[in-house]
Amino acid sequence: ILVRGNTNLGDMNQVSGSLMGVSVVLPILNEERDLRESVSAILAQSYSAPFEVILALGPSTDRTNEIAEELAARDSRVVLVDSPTGRTANGLNAAIARAKYSIISRIDGHAEISPTYLRDATELLNKTGAVNVGGIMAAVGKSKFEKAVATAMRSPLGVGSSRFHTGGKAGPADTVYLGTFKKSALLEAGGYDERFTRAQDWELNFRLRKNGGTIWFDPSLVVTYRPRSTIKALAKQY
């Protein structure tokens, strides 16, 4: 793995009050459309503890990697690692291997987190004792096609009845959208299984629960998700 950025200094458990340092990890492939907005939302977080943003760059065919280089040049908190296969699980594991903080927050390159997301997620980890917390996947489209997909993604008829799609009460769950993890539990479980090209999150959360950990859903954690813009891109996702 080629790392561009500061050398990893190990697992740095820096604390600001009760908040721990966070490594935000993103698997990135062909995210030219949304990458700037996604990373900007992370860098603008209202979070008093230190955090970093690790982009695992796959073999994109658009301007994604150029944009990532620009973001890293402008802000030292942005770190780039190579993910030669471009697969989600591989990229996440590459980013986690580079992470220097004790909390891992997984975000996507076409998703935007709310301004207090990192603070809220970290506080929930402390409050609930869970090993992973997550909330609502708020799908929002801009084009007619994206809006139609977003509507389907918010409906039980479109994607099933998972609370992270349709909402619900806070509490233990089988899985959550994206997730903010205790790094120790994530490493103990072995990280993401790179044999999976789909459902990596569900499978990882299954192993975390098998190890005795709690997965916690809370609707106050909101992530705005922009659906794929074409039928072809959507088909690749599912």
Residue ranges of each PLM-predicted region?
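Acidic donor-binding/catalytic loop of UDP-sugar-dependent glycosyltransferases
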Residues: 63, 109-124, 206
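Glycine-rich, basic loop-to-helix element that forms the pyrophosphate-binding segment
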Residues: 82-99, 120, 176
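Short aromatic/hydrophobic "clamp" motif used to bind/position activated sugar donors
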Residues: 104
